[in-house]
């Protein structure tokens, strides 16, 4: 068993999509950083690595047994044993996992660059561990509240968060089935479409708005998001939290 020591982690909880587990350069001052005093390191094949990074599904039982009680976190000068905590790599991607006692990867973190380099060097000539696990034959279904990586590629942490907020607001707008309202919002998005949307039905306008808004991120996206969330306390709070951030 390989081990890493003094590993800094920034846990992202309940994230099924790896793109929301931020790399070191996107960590923020107000993120909670923890120190793993000792953590086991596993090398697995690319299929299992992708499954762990991009799902919230059961981990192989043998893997859990291999790492059981082998990690320690350093808190307030105490060394606390962890149930199932480990770093896993396929030789390309690297992610730290803490199940907080469950059998699914509840918490995920990237490593700092120096420790990533250490992982690459440690596993370079190591064979991948073989673990049996069930992969769903059905391709993972992405939807408006769990966008595909393709839609999020190239965006900063702040842009990803705001784009997901925009999608949440659009999803809520879809539940209203209010044709006059969706015509208004599409005209806000594209003023030149005013005449066209007067002759379209709710579902068609909403689908067109979503289809156009899901590509990229721009000032136009940000303005639509800001206007859509106005007057909705929960969404407004999320908007304010992101706009307090100066970077990322």
Curated annotation (Swiss-Prot):
<comment type="similarity">
    <text>Belongs to the UPF0736 family.</text>
</comment>
<dbReference type="Pfam" id="PF12227">
    <property type="entry name" value="DUF3603"/>
</dbReference>
<protein>
    <recommendedName>
        <fullName>UPF0736 protein BCE_1296</fullName>
    </recommendedName>
</protein>
<dbReference type="InterPro" id="IPR020909">
    <property type="entry name" value="UPF0736"/>
</dbReference>
């Amino acid at each position: 068993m390989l081990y890493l020591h003094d590993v800094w982690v920034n846990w992202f909880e309940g994230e099924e999509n790896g793109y929301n587990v931020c790399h070191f350069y996107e960590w923020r001052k107000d993120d909670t950083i923890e120190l793993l005093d000792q953590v086991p390191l596993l090398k697995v094949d690319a299929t299992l690595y992708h499954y762990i990074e991009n799902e919230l599904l059961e981990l192989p039982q043998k893997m859990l047994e291999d790492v059981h009680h082998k990690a320690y976190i350093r808190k307030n000068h105490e060394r606390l044993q962890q149930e199932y905590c480990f770093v896993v790599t396929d030789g390309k991607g690297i992610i730290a996992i803490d199940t907080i006692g469950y059998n699914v990867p509840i918490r995920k973190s990237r490593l700092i660059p120096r420790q990533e380099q250490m992982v690459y060097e440690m596993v370079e000539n190591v064979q991948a561990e073989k673990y049996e696990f069930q992969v769903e034959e059905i391709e993972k279904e992405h939807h408006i509240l769990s966008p595909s990586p393709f839609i999020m590629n190239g965006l900063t942490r702040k842009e990803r968060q705001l784009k997901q907020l925009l999608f949440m607001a659009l999803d809520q707008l879809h539940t209203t089935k209010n044709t006059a309202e969706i015509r208004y919002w599409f005209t806000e998005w594209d003023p030149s479409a005013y005449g066209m949307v007067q002759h379209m039905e709710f579902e068609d306008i909403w689908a067109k708005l979503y289809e156009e808004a899901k590509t990229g991120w721009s000032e136009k996206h940000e303005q639509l998001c800001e206007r859509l969330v106005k007057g909705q306390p929960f969404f407004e709070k999320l908007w304010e939290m992101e706009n307090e951030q100066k970077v990322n």
